Amino acid sequence: MINETVLLDAGTVGIALRLDEQKRIRHVLLSHLHHDHIQGLPTLADNLADDIDDPVALTSIPQVLKGLQTYVFNDTIYPDFLKLPDPQHPVFVCRALEIGRESEVDGLRVTAIPVNHLVPTVGFLIR
């Protein structure tokens, strides 16, 4: 957790944070799609699905967000929490960041910086 509402990657969110802490999350900054960085998202979604007012923003570069839609939340591996519990009130929404451009994320200034890795990956400059 960066603060009480912004999470950096989601590897262990479902087991490392208490349910009341998970319910405060409004944004998840995702660096890349490797399993150890996203494996907690389905558990987080399941924990929030029945008691969520506003969706949690999954925030990253377009390649990461597209990969989540194609390979993770595809109703084959996991339910599509980008459309559940219903399309008008999903658990998650995707928010794309442009590399090198500063964006506001819940009061923080976040810039995605490219990182040399095996898959499309960014680090985050957070102010």
Language-model regions: role of each:
Residues M1-R127:
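Binuclear metal-dependent hydrolase catalytic cores
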